[in-house]
Amino acid sequence: MTNSVFQGRSFLAEKDFTRAELEYLIGLSAHLKDLKKRNIQHHYLAGKNIALLFEKTSTRTRAAFTTAAIDLGAHPEYLGANDIQLGKKESTEDTAKVLGRMFDGIEFRGFSQRMVEELAEFSGVPVWNGLTDEWHPTQMLADYLTVQENFGRLEGLTLVYCGDGRNNVANSLLVTGAILGVNVHIFSPKELFPEKEIVELAEGFAKESGAHVLITEDADEAVKDADVLYTDVWVSMGEEDKFAERVALLKPYQVNMDLVKKAGNENLIFLHCLPAFHDTHTVYGKDVAEKFGVEEMEVTDEVFRSKYARHFDQAENRMHTIKAVMAATLGNLYIPKV
């Protein structure tokens, strides 16, 4: 059967989908999560072959796409940075045309948004963005599913992102929230405010949904009546040379218990897309502590382990939401309208 809404489409950025479509995917994710919990098979991709292209390393994205594909009856094949020649020895166009003849769908996690767009343009199969420097759409479905699970709704809630307001997670939270009717506040130093084009895009969606967008470096203004506090690493992959600068700049934007209390909402939840640098129990954490004198970075260990934390639910939801995207765009489902 033909899926007239999603069949054959790529999932490259949230802005390409309507509010109704994103809400449908979140609802489908919840349904597939329930089937998984009840051990009911859902092999909507039986016999399909899925290519997993990774320029950037990953734990959650790789694990989520792999388990989601297997649960759906598909066969995932991992191709790491040393296995693919995108833009190096072979153009992205040529690679896409080859992979599109061998695989039924392609996931890409890397640096360039243009690269994932070229894969979609030339492969002839659905392509799913597992993360680029600009957008992180599969993460957003997991994030907003987690929010919906905790509050029973999305519209009218307030989500506050604390930290680097220019990174892919901040971009995606801002735009996706605006589409879904969620008020999104970016709490960030002016030097790291989101790009003007991203803010304008979000404001356009917010006008349609009734949400509001706030970009501020004032903590009181940012977190007042917050339902969700969200943060991410201070230094994104590829920016390691800016570590000292970011630690100094972002220390006032750390999610700690003082910030939680400032929100004035005992029912708020804390989210983090992980990995989180909340202690010195890793080689990386010890190295940062020795070099920069900080034992906790974007979130304190107290908040990370508190009653407010939902990041491990959020991480699990990566699998369920990725499964929904693959099933809807490639599976034998009939969804004539949303």
Swiss-Prot record:
It is found in: Cytoplasm. Carbamoyl phosphate binds at S58, T59, R60, T61, Q85, R109, H136, P137, T138, Q139, C273, L274, R318. Pathway: Amino-acid degradation; L-arginine degradation via ADI pathway; carbamoyl phosphate from L-arginine: step 2/2. Gene3D superfamilies: Aspartate/ornithine carbamoyltransferase (3.40.50.1370). Disulfide bonds: none annotated. L-ornithine binds at N168, D232, S236, M237. GO terms for molecular function: amino acid binding; ornithine carbamoyltransferase activity. It comes from the Bacteria. One of its GO terms (biological process) is citrulline biosynthetic process. GO terms for cellular component: cytoplasm. The keyword Cell inner membrane does not apply. Its EC number is 2.1.3.3. It catalyses: carbamoyl phosphate + L-ornithine = L-citrulline + phosphate + H(+). It holds the Pfam family OTCace. Keywords: Arginine metabolism, Cytoplasm, Transferase. Reversibly catalyzes the transfer of the carbamoyl group from carbamoyl phosphate (CP) to the N(epsilon) atom of ornithine (ORN) to produce L-citrulline. Belongs to the aspartate/ornithine carbamoyltransferase superfamily. OTCase family. This is Ornithine carbamoyltransferase, catabolic. It comes from Streptococcus pneumoniae serotype 4 (strain ATCC BAA-334 / TIGR4). The gene is arcB.
